[in-house]
Amino acid sequence: MGRVKMSETFSYWIEDNIYPKKWDIIYKQRENQVFLIKINKGSSEYIIVSERFNETMSNSFEIIKIERIQNKSLWRNFDESRKRLNEKYQVSNLDFLESTLFHGTRANDPKLIFSSKVGFDIGKSSFGNYGIGLYFALNASYSNNYSFEESPTSGCKQMFLCRVLLGNSAPPTQKELKNDSTQDSIKGPGGEMFILKSNHTAYPDYLISYRQKVIVNNNTNNNNKNKNKNNNKNNNKNIKIQNENKNENKIENKNENENQFDNYGFNTNFSQNLYDKYGLKYPSQEKPKPGFFTPNKELEYEIFPLLFEKNEKEEELEELEDYQLALLLSTSSLGSK
């Protein structure tokens, strides 16, 4: 892949008077102000820039946001350099003069570049493989190795997409490495890297923020789903067992209650039911005391005579539905009178 053709790919970059047409609210921007405009996803501008990034970047990365940089003084310096280059070669071919390339700032905050009046400063550059200069890459994947990281924990990385004046660009010679060349820029092997030797020959047009994609492992998700299903099954099974145990306990308690006997030797539940039926106050499990029974008037004449004559009327008592109650009462002090 050679230079990106500005005339075909970035036709929307055509300037209106001095500044690019794409610049927003330029009439509100003061001379000393720098605007960082977030580009809306879905806009033609966003699509063009994102495609330029994605086509030369590993698909393991994704764009977080794209911001357009609007620095008036920085742009004017770049525009003046472009005019001089055009006068030098007297060409109308925009592709010869200008290209779009990526640049990573390493540990330096990109803000130090796009908010300054100089921009990319060759005086602050270090000696690289091709001498001192401003290094730009054709591929985003190359600049990714030199990208700026906001913080180790955020995972956000940043790089510039720049407008670069290449002019007459050729592979380096020993003379050019000493920064004593008449060429406008140096072309690295394969044309994938370009080195500029003077200031104001590159403009940081966009700041691209991106990050590593979060890869979801489907196998892990499936395992987690199966694990959750098994946990639910086990929980349901445990609930079922608990309910069964509760029912068993109820049955056991019921059986225990049914097998409980009072001080008179009779089944407690049955005795209670009989007392309730006849409106009697159920005695405590203590030994009965004289007069603790409180039968109603009707029962006083129906049951008590039978109790006092139980020896003579044993057969009648046996026929009574409430035989157990009669026996209970007969063991009391009332029945012994």
From Swiss-Prot:
Membrane spanning stretches: none
Keyword Glycosyltransferase listed: yes
Positions of region (Disordered): 218-247
MF-aspect GO terms: NAD+ poly-ADP-ribosyltransferase activity; NAD+-protein-aspartate ADP-ribosyltransferase activity; NAD+-protein-glutamate ADP-ribosyltransferase activity
Name this protein carries in UniProt: Probable poly [ADP-ribose] polymerase DDB_G0278045
Enzyme class: transferase
Ranges where the PARP catalytic domain occurs: 21-231
SUPFAM superfamilies with a match to the protein in the record: ADP-ribosylation
Organism annotation: Dictyostelium discoideum
Known EC number: 2.4.2.30
Stretches with biased composition (Low complexity): 218-242
Keyword Glycosyltransferase: yes
Top-level lineage group: Eukaryota
Keywords: Glycosyltransferase, NAD, Transferase
Catalytic activity reported: L-aspartyl-[protein] + NAD(+) = 4-O-(ADP-D-ribosyl)-L-aspartyl-[protein] + nicotinamide; L-glutamyl-[protein] + NAD(+) = 5-O-(ADP-D-ribosyl)-L-glutamyl-[protein] + nicotinamide; NAD(+) + (ADP-D-ribosyl)n-acceptor = nicotinamide + (ADP-D-ribosyl)n+1-acceptor + H(+)
